Structures are given as C-alpha cells and as structure tokens.
C-alpha cells in the first residue's frame, strides 16, 4: 500500500507556498512605497500592503527593508506594474495584474499559461469593461451586523453585503474612499479580517465538465507565476468547486 506525502514533504511544500506569497507581498510593498513614499500614514496603498504582510506573519524588519529599498535608502530591484487581459475556455474573462522587473519574461509566461490551457490573451480593455474596481473590507462571522452597517455607511461605504451561509460580511467602497472607510471603521474598533482593492465581475459565467477543469487549471497556473500578483475572473466559483 502506498504512503501519503511525508511530513517533511508537506512542510517543504508549505514553506515554498509561504515564500512565494512573501515575494508577492514584498513586491507590492516596494511598488507602493516607490509610488507614494515610505510613510504608510500618507500612503494608503502602502499601508494596505503592509497590513497584508503583517497578517501573513511577515516580520517588521522584512517590511522595513522592502520600503527602504524602494525609497533609495537601500539598493533594490525596481518593479513596474503591468496588466494583461484575456479569455479562459468557455468565454470566461480573466484579468492578470503583475509586478515585474522584466516585461518580456512576464508576458511570455502569461501567454504560455493561456495557450496551454485553451485560452487566449486579448488586448488592453478587451475584458476589463466586464468588471468594476472597488474596495472590499471583509469581516468574519460574529461581528454585530447593525453596528458594522451603520458605521460603514456613515464612513462613506457604498454597500454592505451579508453572506447568510457563513455569516461573513463585506463592506464595499469606491477605490478612492477605501482608506477613509477603513480608517473610520478601525477608529470604531471594527477591524476587517482582510481588506484590499480588487476587480469584481459584473456577472458570473457558469462552466462545467472539462471546461471547468481547464479554467481552474489556467487560474491556478497564472496565480503560481512569480510575477503575478492577482488574478480576477468572472467564472462562477461554485462551478469550480470553490
């Protein structure tokens, strides 16, 4: 009878996944600091990236070094933001946000993923119109819905969405109101479990069978690329077993 993966094997896989996540967060911190300065109190994007790092148990020293490299206090690599759009099998729209120090490498990697999984890359704007850019502050079950809703609306949020299946709550904002709402809720003692600005599809597309398998394969392959920060799609996640 065969044996499952060893404890050491599982640990190595976990360490690799954690290392990849740290790399992505450090790149986001670097770009945010270079664009808006190294003071998170005056740079909402940097603060969001730092919060993400701290939530992932990244040390403050690692975060500080990333900031200093970006602001010129330490030598570091300069990354640029690039975005690619395309279609997965079944007409599923996909947006891929990247931070890279080599555009040629990145576009080749992204194009390879689309091609290998039966999709195709599109031109700029080819699918972005199917999505809205918005801030999402996510709260776990257990928080008082009325208190959160009142505070969020007063702070300038656009909507509050409650998920009855698990009791989680999302506070939705316009991108330019994201930092204001987050700070107001924090001041009221309401700290989200997760907060970021994302693309959210206007409508989801259902897929099944082999198409669902290929879509999942493409999304996983894109997310696993070192230069890719975020992958958004309009696939119905339930169809992928998510």
UniProtKB/Swiss-Prot annotation:
Subcellular location: Cytoplasm
UniProt record, GO biological process: regulation of DNA-templated transcription
Residues of the signal peptide: none
One protein family per Pfam: Transcrip_reg
A Gene Ontology cellular-component term: cytosol
Family statement: Belongs to the TACO1 family.
Protein origin, superkingdom: Bacteria
GO molecular function, one term: DNA binding
The name this protein goes by in its record: Probable transcriptional regulatory protein XOO1659
Origin organism lineage: Bacteria, Pseudomonadati, Pseudomonadota, Gammaproteobacteria, Lysobacterales
Keyword Cytoplasm assigned: yes
């Amino acid at each position: 009878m065969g044996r499952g993966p060893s404890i050491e094997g599982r640990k190595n896989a976990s360490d690799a996944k954690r290392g990849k996540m740290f790399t992505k967060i450090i790149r986001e911190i670097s770009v945010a600091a270079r664009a808006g300065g190294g003071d998170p109190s005056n740079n909402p994007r940097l603060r969001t990236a730092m919060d993400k790092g701290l939530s992932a148990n990244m040390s403050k020293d690692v975060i500080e070094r990333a900031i200093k490299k970006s602001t010129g206090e330490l030598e570091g690599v300069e990354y640029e933001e690039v975005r690619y759009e395309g279609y997965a099998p079944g007409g599923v729209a996909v947006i891929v946000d990247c931070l890279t120090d080599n555009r040629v490498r990145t576009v080749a990697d992204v194009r390879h993923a689309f091609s290998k999984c039966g999709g195709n890359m599109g031109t700029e704007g080819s699918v972005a119109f199917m999505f809205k850019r918005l801030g999402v502050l996510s709260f776990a079950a257990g928080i008082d819905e009325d208190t959160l809703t009142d505070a969020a609306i007063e702070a300038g949020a656009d909507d509050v969405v409650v998920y009855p299946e698990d009791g989680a709550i999302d506070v939705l904002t316009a991108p330019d109101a994201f930092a204001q709402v987050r700070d107001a809720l924090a001041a009221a003692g309401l700290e989200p479990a997760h907060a970021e600005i994302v693309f959210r599809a206007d409508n989801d597309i259902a897929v099944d069978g082999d198409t669902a398998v290929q879509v999942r394969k493409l999304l996983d392959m894109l997310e696993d690329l070192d230069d890719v920060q975020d992958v958004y799609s309009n696939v119905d996640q339930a169809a992928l077993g998510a």
